[in-house]
Amino acid sequence: MNKTNDHEIDQLIYLFSKLPGLGSRSARRIVLYLLQDKDVRLKSLINNLVEIDKKIVKCKICGNMDTESICSICSSKYRDKSVIAVVETVAELWAMERSGNFKGLYHVLGHNLSAASRQNPSILRLPELLKRCFAENIKEVIIATNSTLEGQTTAYFITEYLKEHPAKISRLASGIPIGGELDYLDEGTLSAAINLRQPFE
């Protein structure tokens, strides 16, 4: 990374460069943009980050991010509470919400499993999922993990873990390419995948 001869600015560039999808060049442009109108752009960002740090918490039911300990999705009376979509991270939850085509509940695993690294399945929130399935009388579990090798491995472990529950288990269908991640799909493709989901064997 090219240095600016200012430690504080270099540190800020470094922090931005670690964000997903950003490299050092993009990070430098962002920092320069903020500093060019520091009183408005930078202070607005700082104030917003402080508020987020104070107010945003993880939903104690599904793992979503919200200002309440039970998020607006879990507490909504308009959601179909007999269906749960299991996603890897909040990013996939947001992607499904953008599609506007899923009206059920969610369960955020927080991780995926890599067959190569031999991760322990205990890193997933599967006990909480099984408990919810029984307590909330869930009729269908939609496995909405990514179509990557890690996502497929994770889907297998979810299916094995839920064998003792009678809920129908399905998987997002057509339109998701092998290796594809939900967060990068357009709303139409993701809507089709939800509508055409199939039983997962």
UniProtKB/Swiss-Prot annotation:
C4-type ZnF: 59-74
Gene Ontology terms for molecular function: DNA binding; zinc ion binding
Keywords linked to the UniProt accession: DNA damage, DNA recombination, DNA repair, Metal-binding, Zinc, Zinc-finger
UniProt superkingdom: Bacteria
Biological process per Gene Ontology, one example term: DNA repair
Pfam family, one: RecR_HhH
Stretches assigned to the Toprim domain: 82-177
Function: May play a role in DNA repair. It seems to be involved in an RecBC-independent recombinational process of DNA repair. It may act with RecF and RecO.
Family: Belongs to the RecR family.
UniProt-recorded name of the protein: Recombination protein RecR
Organism: Rickettsia akari (strain Hartford)
Lineage: Bacteria, Pseudomonadati, Pseudomonadota, Alphaproteobacteria, Rickettsiales
